[in-house]
């Protein structure tokens, strides 16, 4: 009888131990599962619409590829044109998440911090995230000539004399295009009356059109950005100084909307060393 009771007690203790081990193992397994690292969910697909000055076409297309490789959920869609036309499109309601202008004038027109300044923001627009605004790049205004330089043009001061004498045909940007506005400042510097030399001027809707006229030899010379001269393989014979036309600054800003974070991330990328290397390769410099 005692042997039977001893055996029964031993079996009971063994069963309890087995349940305890099972419970402990289950608990340990549950804890391990809860603490196991989980894969971060992929970002939601985003189409980022960027309006940028035409002079940025080549560099921005290269940077788009680089950025999308590291951000596969983001598709960058560009609209390149003159800054004046881009501003008009934005004012008319076109979708735009990030704007990069070839001059402060177009950015100022959307900046709420300048409301009250009738010259800079005449319509009192509040379209950009003011804190996001940065001076991104600087360019140079240059005098370029077609292959062979048939008129032997070498300097801006020489151009001014030839133009006043009606001896050259010059391609410039329209007055609503930043490169055209810089050109008019150069005219003012040399005392050139645009109306008086109108028959010796041809115009482009953006800087790419001006560069094309020079490349095709349709004109004797043209005034374009250094970066566009580089991209078109044109010869630069002179560069305008800040005294002649001011600094050529490219401001950038995020527009108000539902993609501000994505736009800010892309803008931050454009300020990295990797992006600046691309910009500098065609003649831009950090502002």
How would you label these PLM feature ranges?
Residues 17-69, 84, 88, 103-104, ...:
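Exported/periplasmic ABC-transporter solute-binding proteins
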Residues 87, 93-123, 129-134:
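Short beta-strand-centered segments that line the small-molecule binding cleft or hinge
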Residues 76:
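Hydrophobic anchor at the start of a short beta-strand
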Residues 1-4:
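Positively charged n-region of N-terminal signal peptides that target proteins for export
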Residues 12-15:
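C-terminal motif of bacterial Sec signal peptides marking the signal peptidase cleavage site
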């Amino acid at each position: 009888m005692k042997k039977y009771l001893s055996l029964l007690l031993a079996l009971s203790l063994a069963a309890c131990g087995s349940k305890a081990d099972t419970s402990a193992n289950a608990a340990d397994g549950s804890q391990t599962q809860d603490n196991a690292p989980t894969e971060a969910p992929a970002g939601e697909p985003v189409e980022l619409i960027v309006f940028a000055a035409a002079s940025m076409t080549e560099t921005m297309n290269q940077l788009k590829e680089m950025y999308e490789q590291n951000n596969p959920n983001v598709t960058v869609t560009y609209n390149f044109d003159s800054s004046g036309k881009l501003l008009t499109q934005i004012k008319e309601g076109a979708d735009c998440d990030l704007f990069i202008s070839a001059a402060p004038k177009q950015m100022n027109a959307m900046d709420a911090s300048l409301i009250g300044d009738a010259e800079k923001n005449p319509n009192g627009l509040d379209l950009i995230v003011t804190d996001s605004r940065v001076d991104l790049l600087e360019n140079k205004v240059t005098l370029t000539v077609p292959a062979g330089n048939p008129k032997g043009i070498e300097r801006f001061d020489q151009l001014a004399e030839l133009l006043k004498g009606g001896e050259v045909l010059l391609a410039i940007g329209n007055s609503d295009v930043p490169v055209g506005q810089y050109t008019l400042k150069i005219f003012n510097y040399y005392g050139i009356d645009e109306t008086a030399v109108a028959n010796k001027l041809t115009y482009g809707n953006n800087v790419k059109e001006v560069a094309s006229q020079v490349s095709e030899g349709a004109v004797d010379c043209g005034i374009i950005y250094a970066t566009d001269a580089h991209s078109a393989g044109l010869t630069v014979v002179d560069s305008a100084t800040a005294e002649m036309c001011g600094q050529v600054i490219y401001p950038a800003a995020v527009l108000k909307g539902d993609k501000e974070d994505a736009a800010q991330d892309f803008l931050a990328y454009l300020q990295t060393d990797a992006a600046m290397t691309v910009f500098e390769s065609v003649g831009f410099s950090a502002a």
